[in-house]
A protein has these predicted regions:
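Membrane-interface coil-to-helix junctions
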Residues: 24-120, 148-163, 304-325, 381-385
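Transmembrane signal-anchor helices characteristic of membrane glycosylation enzymes that use polyprenol
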Residues: 14-46, 53, 57-60, 270-290, ...
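Signature aromatic-anchored transmembrane alpha helix within multi-pass, membrane-resident enzymes
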Residues: 265-274, 359-360, 415, 419-449
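Extracytoplasmic
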Residues: 444-584
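Periplasmic/ER-lumenal interhelical loops and adjacent helix-loop junctions
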Residues: 45-61, 236, 243-247, 272-351
Length: 584
């Protein structure tokens, strides 16, 4: 029996074992790469700043500075531009709090970025501690989900960072099946919906994971793992199939029957509210899909489906870079950095080979089986993939980078790893404990020694300051002097030859956001009709005419109403006649 006097000390030690790895990771993997005084931004001049724009747009919207959330003023005058990509509505309030505390736009983004890692780890710890895993098992599983190599490989895509809904939703699905209750069903729906609001990509992949787990759960029930009976095989097979078919209806009926009438009504109201909020979120995406015709061809998706070799690529890891180099290059390789790390692979092999019986075994192999199924379904070999059948489901034709499903699969992988570590720790062998602590240290080092992609915050801000200065100094015909700005001006910025095409587009978006102007420039996951790189001023009339064709406008006055408001910056080939007559 535990000594009551030592319980507080033991609890403190347990919490230290859980949280010290997180703090080390936060310092060495997240904070240190951001440079002294947070001088560096995670990622490059592309998606990082685009996500910063989205978050700032939300902040301006709640302040009343931007009138319509979904009609952000880039790719102007095309509507519903926020729905061209992820919206970050589920996490933008956190950013707004940082902005309200007087942090500037870029620093508030860094704070939002760092908070995401804390929330992911906290969700893991909450779930795994409720399962009563040993502290070191909790730490290793949570560390992998939060700081694992596949997650770091997506640091240029901050929209994929917040995944705290994944462990919470998966845990509630398991708990509901074990002990049905409508509160758990409501909680499951809540975290799924919030995950969609945090990021549509992760939300869709979470639903796929939950669907597979729901199908598997009856097979991993306590009855399924009971001792074999003496019935003939065909009777056992029929009984197993019947139990599998009826399992979920019986669980739902049990949860419903054991709830009071007020509880049932409250459940229906809450689920209806969650459904309505999800419909409100996805409605604009449905709209742009049909109005703009956005969808991904199967050939586009095929490039972004995991290949067998994808799970062995970690080009940014100095530890595994040489091994990754033996894999021949292929299109979109940056999206195929799916190697989970040598430590996790070793833990998985140990868990599969030892099959140590513990109270978590059913849960562990449920998670591992779900990973195996989704890996097989999404895998492409010589152009063939079972995912082609899923691709026809509503919404999935808009998903291009299916490789990102690894970010969701890191949770069930982490659960299985936690189970293995917990089972080994239960053997209470000093030498085995030492090996486990060594494995945890190596897992930390795999992520610490990672070549991060960062951008100078000062350089990014200087780009915007330089663009603002051009508004006042550029000559007429290539830009309008500030004293002669038209009413309600529209910004249009050229691309310097040395710049990647997206950098000046986002420069224009951010400067226009500061000024409260719309801009013809833009960057997103999809592009409107007629979009061209801003290498030539001819994009200006072409984009306006593309908008007119999109809205079925044909009169020259509509063209002139728009172009007379345009302030072009950095172009040398603008024809002054375009401002008085629509070109053919």
């Amino acid at each position: 029996m535990d000594n009551p006097k030592t319980k507080p000390v033991k609890a403190l030690i347990d919490q230290a074992v859980v949280w010290i790895p997180f703090l080390l990771g936060f310092w060495l993997i997240i904070l240190r790469p951001l440079g002294p005084n947070l001088s560096l931004m995670p990622g490059d001049l592309g998606d990082t700043r685009f996500n910063n724009y989205l978050l700032e747009h939300f902040f301006r919207w709640i302040l009343g500075l931007d009138k319509n959330y979904w009609n952000a003023a880039f790719f102007y005058p095309f509507p519903n531009t926020i729905a061209f990509s992820d919206n970050l509505l589920g996490t933008a309030p956190f950013y707004a709090l940082f902005r309200a505390s007087r942090l500037d736009r870029e620093t508030a983004f860094q704070a939002w970025y760092m908070l995401g890692f804390l929330m992911n780890y906290t969700a893991c710890v909450y779930v795994l501690q409720r399962l009563k895993l040993k502290p070191l098992a909790v730490a290793i599983a949570g560390f992998f989900f939060t700081y694992g190599l596949p997650n770091l490989a997506q640091e240029t895509h901050a929209q994929l960072l917040y995944r705290f809904g994944v462990p919470l939703a998966c845990a509630l699905l398991w708990q509901f099946f074990q002990e049905p209750g409508l509160k758990k069903l409501v909680g499951l729906a809540f975290w799924c919906v919030w995950q969609f609001f945090a990021g549509v990509y992760i939300g869709i992949f979470l639903v796929l994971l939950l669907a597979v787990m729901a199908v598997l759960l009856p097979l991993f029930s306590s009855q399924s793992w009971a001792q074999k009976n003496t019935d003939p095989w065909y009777r056992r097979a029929f009984k197993a199939v019947w139990q599998w078919i009826t399992a979920w209806p019986l669980k739902l009926n049990l949860a419903w029957s054991e709830t009071t009438l007020p509880g049932r009504l409250a459940t229906l109201v809450i689920l209806a509210g969650l459904g309505a909020s999800l419909a409100a979120l996805l409605g604009p995406y449905y709209n742009v899909t049909h109005v703009y015709g956005f969808s991904r061809s199967w050939n586009d998706v095929l490039l972004m489906l995991p290949k067998p070799q994808s799970y062995f690529i970690a080009d940014q890891s100095p530890i595994w870079q040489a091994a990754s180099g033996f894999i021949a290059d292929f299109t979109a390789r940056r999206e195929h950095q799916l190697f989970p790390g040598g430590v996790i692979i070793l833990i998985l092999l140990v868990g599969i080979s030892l099959r140590v019986p513990t109270q978590y075994r059913r849960l562990a192999f449920l998670n591992l089986s779900a990973v195996a199924i989704l890996v097989v379904v999404t895998l492409t070999i010589h152009g063939f993939s079972l995912y082609h059948f899923l691709w026809y489901l509503p919404g999935l034709k808009s998903i291009r980078a299916v490789t990102r499903i690894e970010l969701v699969l890191m949770w069930p992988l982490g659960v299985f790893a936690g189970y293995v570590i917990d089972a080994l720790l239960q053997r209470q062998r000093l030498w085995l404990n030492a090996i486990i602590y060594l494995a945890g240290s190596l897992l930390l080092l795999e992520s610490v020694f990672y070549n991060h992609t960062t951008t100078s915050k000062a350089d990014a801000q200087a780009r915007l300051a330089n663009l603002r200065s051009q508004l006042a100094t550029a000559p007429a015909a290539t830009a309008v002097p500030e004293a002669a700005l038209p009413a309600d001006p529209i910004l249009f910025v050229a691309r310097p030859q040395w710049d990647p095409w997206y950098a000046p587009e986002i420069d224009a978006m951010l400067v226009a956001q500061d000024l409260g102007w719309p801009t013809l420039n833009g960057y997103s996951g999809n592009f409107p009709p007629g979009f061209q790189f801003a290498d030539s001023c001819s994009r200006l009339p072409n984009q306006i005419k593309a908008y007119m064709a999109f809205t079925r406008l044909s009169d020259a006055s509509s063209y002139l109403d728009i172009i007379k408001r345009v302030v072009p910056i950095g172009f040398k080939d603008c024809d002054p006649n375009w401002w008085s007559k629509m070109p053919n």
